[in-house]
């Protein structure tokens, strides 16, 4: 019996995690835009470019609209899926939100360009996993 070979799918995190870890999420949207075309040609399955601390840092420190950032990234990545890191019931914040708020935020994230949502929840709530099918 032949073993089915599945392709390796690579997800790149440089536009979210690299500057989050190295320079406290201070990379502006304008600094990201020049490399998008080259990244889009690499053949990544997805680029994780939103979520985690990017939303807060965009507003609080960079004085940017995080939704506009997402739309600009979506416009630039023609062939690559966009992924976000989502804090479960906390969305992208630091406290839990009501289920309807979480659902609305997920809907708006998808409407603005997100294809894949990677969920991490600090206490691994079963309810978050069950509700993640929004």
Which positions does each model-derived feature cover?
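N-terminal amphipathic alpha-helix/helix-capping segment at the start of soluble metabolic enzymes
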Residues: 1-23, 70, 75
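Glycine-rich, proline-tolerant flexible connector loops at the mouths of alpha/beta enzymes
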Residues: 23, 45-70, 88-94, 120-127
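Conserved small/polar residues in nucleotide/adenosyl-binding loops
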Residues: 128-132
């Amino acid at each position: 019996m032949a073993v089915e070979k599945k392709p390796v799918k690579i997800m790149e995190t440089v536009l979210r995690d690299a500057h989050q870890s190295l320079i406290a999420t201070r990379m502006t949207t304008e600094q990201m835009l020049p490399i998008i075309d080259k990244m889009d040609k690499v053949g990544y399955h997805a680029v994780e470019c939103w979520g985690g601390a990017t939303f807060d840092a965009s507003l609080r420190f960079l004085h940017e609209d995080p939704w506009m950032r997402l739309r600009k990234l979506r416009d630039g990545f023609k062939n690559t899926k966009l992924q976000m890191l989502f804090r479960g019931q906390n969305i992208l914040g630091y406290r839990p939100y009501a289920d309807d708020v979480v659902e609305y935020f997920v809907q708006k994230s998808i409407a603005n360009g997100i294809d894949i949502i990677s969920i991490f929840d600090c206490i691994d709530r079963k309810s978050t996993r069950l509700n993640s099918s929004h």
